[in-house]
Amino acid sequence: MASRFPKFSQGLSQDPTTRRIWFGIATAHDFESHDNITEERLYQKIFASHFGQLAIIFLWTSGNLFHVAWQGNFEAWVQDPLHVRPIAHAIWDPHFGEPAVEAFTRGGALGPVNIAYSGVYQWWYTIGLRTIQDLYIGALFLLFLAAVFLIAGWLHLQPKWKPSVSWFKNAESRLNHHLSGLFGVSSLAWAGHLIHVAIPESRGEHVRWDNLLTALPHPQGLKPFFEGQWGIYAENADSSSHLFSTSQGAGTAILTFIGGFHPQTQSLWLTDIAHHHLAIAVVFIIAGHMYRTNFGIGHSIKEILETHTPPGGRLGRGHKGLYDTINNSLHFQLGLALASTGVITSLVAQHMYSLPSYAYIAQDFTTQAALYTHHQYIAGFIMTGAFAHGAIFFIRDYNPEQNKDNVLARMLEHKEAIISHLSWASLFLGFHTLGLYVHNDVMLAFGTPEKQILIEPVFAQWIQSAHGKTLYGFDLLLSSADSPAFNAGQSIWLPGWLDAINNNSNSLFLTIGPGDFLVHHAIALGLHTTTLILVKGALDARGSKLMPDKKEFGYSFPCDGPGRGGTCDISAWDAFYLAVFWMLNTIGWVTFYWHWKHITLWQGNVAQFNESSTYLMGWLRDYLWLNSSQLINGYNPFGMNSLSVWAWMFLFGHLVWATGFMFLISWRGYWQELIETLTWAHERTPLANLVRWRDKPVALSIVQARLVGLTHFSVGYIFTYAAFLIASTSGKFG
């Protein structure tokens, strides 16, 4: 008999019901649970899959370059970045009638096209690409890289090239290589590209392979470097009247510390960016020589951790036992990696708009909104994943003997205190914030807006002032003309910073008031509640007073039958599942806030946000309803417009979202009865009953249905908001 899916589980492949298919898909990537898995094969499979992942990323980015080169308008956009709309790719759709073809033929194209809201045009322009040929060369190079990585992945699965477990567990060597090689050398290479290609291009000098070795990035070459006169590289920076991509007003500096933004492009100075990457490179290349490997010099991570015992003994045995615990647990390592990547992704969202590094991207409002929202949602999923794998670590990999009285054991021992404090913070934030919003709502409804409770965010304003924002009248640090920091800043470092922070046309340190204070606390409520659910899920994953033997049931179980009185909904997976809803809603509030604040800033009517954001009806009426009205009107009796695709996606997103509830609200028995009825009907219907099934149809398990419901909820939620965001922004600003 031919082997059936899934090959990795003999038991499951013999299941006579449709559970075989769904459970097979669900456990396909849980390598640890597969038949005949050894630690060595586990590590090798994961290692090989990393090469596949990188190949997919390179193929995808190659596709972006290729489609823009083939169907885009890059060269036309380069001539006039502020007025030509960048084209992502053409649309071929046989359903398009004349009105649709007309509506979607934009950006100087000959037929229907999609506009690019990803910022790739601005990115490629900033790093020195100027022609379609440049894009094609980039696409081919990335395609070649993808092939190299696929071959490397295959190679590392061959017996001769398979790394051993000891190689995977050599933490010091890996850290050295990742710090020096991955971060350090790649940052150095990027600084090199900026200095040799991007900065000359921004000054109208075209550097390509034919003149790379003959075009000097700086008139004095390497002489100042070897003489230690490094300051020469910062002299004669681009002037404030510099026209980007031309020599007019251009300087010769390559490494500067100007601060603020280029007046024309509204983006960070390229010479500042090159300086930043060079500094990062130096720091990380040094950091990558810190850990002890074959040469007997440098730090041993294990020794550092073992030595970390808190003074006075009040905090137990500190980090003792952590080295082996982390080094032997892939889930712990993945949890740490996801936690840091999640934070970094959220920081990227924050910095891409407040300190834009790509030329003209700050004036492309729809792209700014799309990139912020995209990175915040990605960050949310990655961060919840960190806690999920933290919980799996506690269930599968945590060994109480190895971690006696260290920080991990102590976290578990006083989990009640941690969870109850988080609970208190969430309750406090929720009741007070909602109380203020509802009070203000009632005052507006009764026609007495002056009775609203409006709280100025004085601490946040004080922090903004310390950084140089003079508007609030706090006279301190960088906002005080008498402070040493202010005086030093004029000449030595960041002279452009103070101009930028006090200029109302950018998004650096936005002016804040009572509306910001309220929504800030609403977001804090969401963050704390999400964290509460996730932390509780991980800390209770091994067991709780209610269910001390929980870890024996694994990561995801529905219940332990009716006999134990309430063991449903308490698996670590359930905590993750509930937290994702809170995460999505929290990021909803974050993106609503960001988008409304910026729409009013870009339209020049900040008063609308300031006045309407202090009560709930303001948010519902003046943000959601007002900005979705165009969307709902994408199709009408008078034809269609270029927003109609977003109108359709807005409707479709709601549909997908609502479908989620079908899986979330009704339980398994209902579906099992329905399936049995349909099966009965099928078997008794002529012609239909000629078609038989190999697997007996059964309903999804409770956990599987929750996953399907959660996926529909998440996808629908994001589709709906994406359509709303892009249509409402592009409808206003083009």
Curated annotation (Swiss-Prot):
Signal peptide (from-to): none
Gene Ontology biological-process entries: photosynthesis
Keywords of the record: 4Fe-4S, Chlorophyll, Chloroplast, Chromophore, Electron transport, Iron, Iron-sulfur, Magnesium, Membrane, Metal-binding, Oxidoreductase, Photosynthesis, Photosystem I, Plastid, Thylakoid, Transmembrane, Transmembrane helix, Transport
Subcellular location: Plastid, Chloroplast thylakoid membrane
Protein EC: 1.97.1.12
Transmembrane segments: 46-69, 135-158, 175-199, 273-291, 330-353, 369-395, 417-439, 517-535, 575-596, 643-665, 707-727
Bilayer topology term: Multi-pass membrane protein
UniProt-listed Pfam families: PsaA_PsaB
GO CC field: chloroplast thylakoid membrane; photosystem I
Principal localisation: plastid
Cofactor note as given: P700 is a chlorophyll a/chlorophyll a' dimer, A0 is one or more chlorophyll a, A1 is one or both phylloquinones and FX is a shared 4Fe-4S iron-sulfur center.
Keyword Transmembrane: yes
Annotated residues for binding of chlorophyll a B1: H654
Keyword Amino-acid biosynthesis: no
Binding positions for chlorophyll a B3 per the UniProt entry: M662, Y670
Protein residues bound to phylloquinone: W671
UniProt-recorded Gene Ontology molecular function terms: 4 iron, 4 sulfur cluster binding; chlorophyll binding; electron transfer activity; magnesium ion binding; oxidoreductase activity
Catalytic activity entry: reduced [plastocyanin] + hnu + oxidized [2Fe-2S]-[ferredoxin] = oxidized [plastocyanin] + reduced [2Fe-2S]-[ferredoxin]
Family: Belongs to the PsaA/PsaB family.
Family matches, as NCBIfam families: psaB (TIGR01336)
Subunit structure and binding partners: The PsaA/B heterodimer binds the P700 chlorophyll special pair and subsequent electron acceptors. PSI consists of a core antenna complex that captures photons, and an electron transfer chain that converts photonic excitation into a charge separation. The eukaryotic PSI reaction center is composed of at least 11 subunits.
Protein name (database record): Photosystem I P700 chlorophyll a apoprotein A2
Organism: Anthoceros angustus (Hornwort)
Native organism taxonomy: Eukaryota, Viridiplantae, Streptophyta, Embryophyta, Anthocerotophyta
